[in-house]
Curated annotation (Swiss-Prot):
Family of this protein: Belongs to the methyltransferase superfamily. RNA methyltransferase RsmG family.
Job of this protein: Specifically methylates the N7 position of guanine in position 527 of 16S rRNA.
UniProt-listed Enzyme Commission number(s): 2.1.1.170
Name the UniProt record assigns to this protein: Ribosomal RNA small subunit methyltransferase G
Length: 260
């Protein structure tokens, strides 16, 4: 049994916040009702306790989160059911990657979607000289959201509205760390990450409860020495850390995979 299989297990942690709203009186029935925020202050506090950030970074994250909630009403950026746990489930889940690559300045985030982890990392690294986060997203609406998120937060994110393969082929310069979250099967992700890892990048790939099955399948096509990190946010999340990716005889074709 491989080391990563021995290390595989589950962490469960529930983070919830409850709030009591006082009765406002009968005349409140006639007043326009303001939309209630789907976010939880307790969830934010729990996330920042897990992954502390500076006040400047927190302010940038607040601006990003507000924008995401606005856009979520018209563009499906994340599962709406996860909004009450947005800070722990998405923000903290992204921030924890920084501890695994503390010296990395140039990042490439494949399939950035709603900005996890790419925009979150950009918010955290905005004050680091020379930092740059490439956000690769071919969906036009999501790329437009990412562009606006980078603009209002003033972060060092660069939007690449193209397929991942095209980005890798055109890449100029060295990447320190490549990331992907909720994107594609591991054996496919390795094909995209391989050229960057061969040039010295570290791969940090966020996976869910099926990580063991994905690793088993991936090792049919790739020689890898993965290190598994259970998510600091609890639940069934895992981070697959890789410093080496080598092809076997029959790697899966990237063309066989199409992102929804």
């Amino acid at each position: 049994m491989a080391d990563w299989q021995k290390a595989h297990g589950r962490l469960q942690r529930d983070v919830a916040g409850n709030r009591t709203v006082p009765y406002a009186g009968a005349d409140a029935m006639t007043r326009p009702r303001q939309a209630q925020s789907p976010l939880s202050a307790a969830d934010k506090a729990a996330a920042l306790a897990l992954t502390p950030v500076s006040r400047e970074t927190e302010a940038r994250l607040d601006a990003y989160v507000d924008l995401l909630v606005q856009w979520q009403t018209k563009t499906n950026l994340i599962a709406s059911s996860t909004l009450p746990q947005l800070w722990t489930r998405h923000i903290a889940d992204s921030l924890q990657l920084l501890a695994l690559a503390p010296q990395a300045k140039r990042w490439a985030d494949f399939g950035s979607g709603g900005g996890f982890p790419g925009v979150v990392l950009a918010c955290a690294l905005a004050d680091v000289e020379g930092a740059r986060i490439d956000l690769v997203e071919r969906n036009a609406k999501k790329a437009a959201f990412l562009r606006e998120a980078v603009r209002i937060t003033g972060t060092p994110g660069v939007i690449h509205p193209m397929d991942i393969g095209d980005y890798v082929d055109r890449l100029d310069g060295r990447i320190d760390c490549v990331t992907a979250r909720a994107l594609a099967p591991l054996q496919v992700l390795l094909g995209f990450a391989e050229p960057l890892v061969k040039q010295g990048a570290k791969a940090l790939l966020l996976k869910g409860q099926d990580v063991e099955a994905e690793l088993t399948e991936a090792t049919k096509y790739w020689n890898i020495e993965p290190r598994l990190h259970s998510s600091r946010t609890g639940g069934q999340g895992w981070i697959v850390e890789l410093d080496r990716i080598e092809r076997r005889d029959r790697p899966p074709t990237k063309q066989a995979w199409r992102r929804a």
